[in-house]
Amino acid sequence: MTSENQSSPRTLTDDRHGAVISDDGTYRYRLWRTWDTSKPVLAFVLLNPSTADATTDDPTLRRCQGYAEQWGYGKVELVNLFALRSTDPDQLYEHDNPVGPENNQYLQDVCEDADKVIVAWGNHGTLDGRGDTVTELLDTDLYALDVTNQEQPTHPLYQPRDTDLELFDREMQ
């Protein structure tokens, strides 16, 4: 699988739902849901996007939105270490550019604008040292739901709904 056809992203949105996806559909750079604009914004940095877009939710988005609502936020933003859209993390190892040509800028912009940032990519975040690269890129406090036995921040689908946040120790990676 290659990414020879680089294309600029397009934003698909309405008042409460949105996504930024490359024109060819290979990459999703940003996904969000808003339910109360008077409340703060919670961002999640996950591994890679799957099927969710401006109009379709997936289990990860629903779980992240559930946490955000439970903790008093009015918007959830999802960005990823790798922007390659795939339901199979093994595809990240096979693609020549799983990060995506514009991903770092979206990561920085979303995390800079969020009131709190949760990292939650699981053990595959060690691929090409990407987790370390992104934590160095982000100039804000980072939180995690928990960490794996490889000291990577756990994915939201593998945590109970009543999980508490903890400050993520960047040095553990």
For each feature predicted by the language model, list its residue ranges.
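Active-site and ligand/interface coordination hotspots across diverse enzymes
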Residues: 1-58
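Glycine/proline-rich loop-helix segments at beta-alpha junctions forming the active-site rim
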Residues: 92-173
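Short connector loops at secondary-structure junctions
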Residues: 74-90
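A short mixed-secondary-structure module that forms the rim of ligand-binding clefts
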Residues: 50-72
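Hydrophobic alpha-helical segments
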Residues: 1-3, 63, 71, 85, ...
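Acidic, metal-coordinating catalytic cores used for nucleic-acid/nucleotide bond scission
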Residues: 53, 83-85, 123-129
